[in-house]
Amino acid sequence: MRPSGRTAQQVRPITITRHFTAHAEGSVLVEFGNTKVICTASVEENVPRWLKGKGKGWVTAEYGMLPRATHTRNNREAASGKQGGRTMEIQRLIARSLRAAVDLEALGEQMITVDCDVIQADGGTRTASITGASVALADAINHMIASGKLKKNPMKGHVAAVSVGIYKGEAICDLEYLEDSAADTDMNVVMMEDGKMIEVQGTAEVAPFSHQELLDMLALAQQGINDIIEKQKAALAE
């Protein structure tokens, strides 16, 4: 039995609130149970120096956590003068996931930066960030189309992510903190809405996992991501 009483394949209650902040071209509060992340997408009419003159745009991301997003306070990374390795890994993952969903040539020489700020963490912050960032990105692109900065939509489709793992000998989907901290195996999966995978990150935290367990986790991830993408579509239709 899972701590929350959920079935193995059941994701947490998901809420996606659009237009959450006033100034960004796209902004979302995404909630996966008690994990809450603000995702804002900002448009700039320039690209990194190495892309200038190439007729392509760029999508990048930054990630951070409020000091008391977790059970005990963490110092702000700015206080130490550098980002931690975990932070850099996660923001690169978010950026790669979003770029896979965008035709960068169709974006033109414009850049979209998506900031993901975790205000409360209960497991799955990177997967919630990707899910919310995709909606914020879609809103920013729609804003660009409406303002004449784009003639066509460069998004190839929705992208979403979910965690899966082996907990008490069973493959489960969308781990909360109590499960994540006690899991034998932890895996994050990022997929497009057509079912193609963007990234699979899996680690045997306690015990190695079998080929069959890998297949079980991937099947749960696909089912969970399908459910999450329906939530994204419903939010964007409002």
Curated annotation (Swiss-Prot):
The gene is rph. It is an enzyme of class 2 (transferase). Keywords: Nucleotidyltransferase, RNA-binding, rRNA processing, Transferase, tRNA processing, tRNA-binding. One of its GO terms (biological process) is rRNA processing. It comes from the Bacteria. Its EC number is 2.7.7.56. Belongs to the RNase PH family. This is Ribonuclease PH. GO terms for molecular function: 3'-5'-RNA exonuclease activity; tRNA binding; tRNA nucleotidyltransferase activity. InterPro entries: ExoRNase_PH_dom1, ExoRNase_PH_dom2, ExoRNase_PH_dom2_sf, PNPase/RNase_PH_dom_sf, Ribosomal_Su5_D2-typ_SF, RNase_PH, RNase_PH_bac-type, RNase_PH_CS. Phosphorolytic 3'-5' exoribonuclease that plays an important role in tRNA 3'-end maturation. Removes nucleotide residues following the 3'-CCA terminus of tRNAs; can also add nucleotides to the ends of RNA molecules by using nucleoside diphosphates as substrates, but this may not be physiologically important. Probably plays a role in initiation of 16S rRNA degradation (leading to ribosome degradation) during starvation. It catalyses: tRNA(n+1) + phosphate = tRNA(n) + a ribonucleoside 5'-diphosphate. Homohexameric ring arranged as a trimer of dimers. Phosphate binds at R86, G124, T125, R126. PROSITE patterns: RIBONUCLEASE_PH.
